[in-house]
């Protein structure tokens, strides 16, 4: 009997997670709402902000750089920032505590009509919950990229996008980056239709 191939099994598990996500129409609708909120924010001259811990911070940075740089084709730079500056984060953590590292940044940069993408695989990261709290007080729309049922964040954000089925952060993050890329493409298609052969 041939032993199971763990590498193939990992790909199969990733596919099963995506299939579970697509099986619920509410999930695709939430990504539409995310893309619409981001496009509307940019049309108003607002700022896209993002934050996360560990691998989710990498996703937050990836999201922002696709706007300030480009996604697929050259176009005007768009205002987006990930709260990932080491000196800023360590200053805030040292002086105010780690739970405040993103909240202080939202307080500093965010204004009514902006958008915050809050990324947490558990939905319960205290510093993400604090950032959401501050954002809501300022009239900032919050999209949550979440996992494991959505945690506390699910009830706090305007647009919760919860990865189903997955038990581990890596599987959750794999779907988060798909959601981010697809939302970015949707925003580009609206703001720069010529880049996609659309009028």
How would you label these PLM feature ranges?
Residues 45-46, 113, 139-140:
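Glycine-centered short loops/turns at secondary-structure junctions
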Residues 145-157:
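Short, glycine/polar-rich helix-capping loops at beta-to-alpha or helix-loop-helix junctions
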Residues 132-136:
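Surface-exposed amphipathic alpha-helices with a cationic face
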Residues 1-26:
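Generic N-terminal amphipathic, Lys/Arg-enriched alpha-helix
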Residues 56-61, 124-131, 153:
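Short glycine/serine/threonine-rich phosphate/pyrophosphate-binding segments
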Residues 116, 142, 160-161:
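Short, well-ordered beta-strand core segments
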Residues 169-199:
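A charged, well-structured terminal subsegment
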Residues 36-110:
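Glycine-rich, small/polar surface segments that engage phosphate groups of diverse ligands
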